[in-house]
Swiss-Prot record:
Its main location: membrane. The chain crosses the membrane at residues 48-68, 84-104, 122-143, 167-187, 213-233, 275-295, 310-333. The gene is Taar7f. InterPro entries: GPCR_Rhodpsn, GPCR_Rhodpsn_7TM, TAAR, TAAR_fam. One of its GO terms (biological process) is sensory perception of chemical stimulus. Glycans are attached at N34, N210. This is Trace amine-associated receptor 7f. In addition to the well known disulfide bond common to G-protein coupled receptor 1 family, trace amine-associated receptors (TAARs) contain an unique disulfide bond (Cys-37-Cys-201) connecting the N-terminus to the extracellular Loop 2 (ECL2), which is required for agonist-induced receptor activation.
């Protein structure tokens, strides 16, 4: 999302200060229009590098999350309430890679918006909506993991497919409603009319956000974030206690193999750890952006444009991180990827393939 990347703090510069590169002289986004925004293009070398970096992120977000969705939806062994949440999260990140990143890439490198005023607003709505959708999904996933770790045997009856569906529906409906109401009602621009008028030009895409809405945006981000931090703190305390109890019982009984309950608890702790890393990656990507946006709104938008864009693209790259995290920690996901890319997923009864080693 780029709530702030669409705000009054944006101008027509791109991700790194043009002064850092040998840029050509200033041009216009539309040479034949008097109201055209000024464009300061990069020289060919840096321009190619930026397109490669941003394009790689978009491709990774699209392909990686598509693999996650395909794996979970195709293989029956992965059909669980928790995994459906993960697939829905991957869908939000996939849409960032398809609907947001390519257009932001052109704007960041070229310094102009070439996709029309209507799609400027729609692009911002997608940006905001998919961001908060990811956030809400991660929050619900953390609650799911807490239930699974704290009471693994009762977990299947507490977090059912119905509960998962309600969480998914809530995440999508709330985030889309919030994103579109923020942009299309014009409430975020209240009190900034003169500034908006002075910044308006053809080839620009600035959506002004006043201090009130910056505070609301930050609050909507902060509340689920605090929930996730609190829940995962409890998860790791419980996991640590369970590990100590299992070790103590193993020594006392000298048993050769773990009980079913212990194996379930171990599996749930591993899942909680992996998804905890995904949450940590999300927070590390998003916190700097939101903190800077919040402070900057009350200091007159003094943050240099290139700093904003660096933060924004760190945020965008977060959409590509989760598939990499799953691939690193989940053997079943690596096996699913292999079956998919080799075409074996097209074979008859491939959906019943055993993806787990244990």
């Amino acid at each position: 999302m780029s709530i702030a990347d669409e705000t009054v703090s944006w101008n027509q510069d791109s991700i790194l200060s043009r002064d850092l590169f040998s840029a050509t002289s200033a041009e216009l986004c539309y040479e034949n229009l008097n109201r055209s925004c000024v464009r300061s293009p990069y020289s060919p070398g840096p321009r190619l590098i930026l397109y490669a970096v941003f394009g790689f992120g978009a491709v990774l977000a699209v392909c990686g999350n598509l693999l996650v969705m395909t794996s979970i939806l195709h293989f029956r062994q992965l059909h669980s309430p928790a995994n459906f949440l993960v697939a829905s999260l991957a869908c939000a990140d996939f849409l960032v890679g398809v609907m947001v990143m390519p257009f932001s890439m052109v704007r960041s490198v070229e310094g102009c918006w070439y996709f029309g005023d209507s799609y400027c607003k729609l692009h911002t709505c997608f940006d905001v909506s998919f961001c908060y959708c990811s956030l809400f999904h991660l929050c619900f996933i953390s609650v799911d993991r807490y239930i699974a770790v704290s009471d693994p045997l009762a977990y299947p009856t507490r977090f059912t497919a119905s509960v998962s569906g309600k969480c998914i529906t809530f995440s999508w409906l709330l985030s889309i409603s919030y994103g579109f109401s923020l942009i299309y009602t014009g409430a975020s621009e209240a009190g900034l009319e003169d500034l908006v008028s002075s910044l308006t030009c053809v080839g620009g895409c600035q959506i002004a956000v006043n201090q009130t809405w910056v505070f609301i945006n930050f609050s909507v981000f902060l509340i689920p974030t605090l929930v996730m931090i609190t829940v995962y703190s409890k998860i790791f305390l419980i996991a640590k206690q369970q590990a100590q109890n299992i070790e103590k019982m193993s020594k006392q009984t000298a048993r050769a193999s773990d009980s079913y309950k212990d194996r379930v608890a171990k599996r749930e702790r591993k899942a909680a750890k992996t998804l905890g890393i995904a949450v940590a990656a999300f927070l590390l990507s998003w916190l700097p952006y939101f903190i800077d946006s919040f402070i900057d709104a009350f200091l007159g938008f003094i943050t240099p444009t290139y700093v904003y864009e660096i933060l924004v693209w760190i945020v965008y790259y977060n959409s590509a991180m989760n598939p990499l995290i799953y691939a690193f920690f989940y053997p079943w996901f690596r096996k699913a990827i292999k079956l998919t890319v080799t075409g074996k997923i097209l074979r008859e009864n491939s959906s019943t393939t055993n993806l787990f080693s244990e």
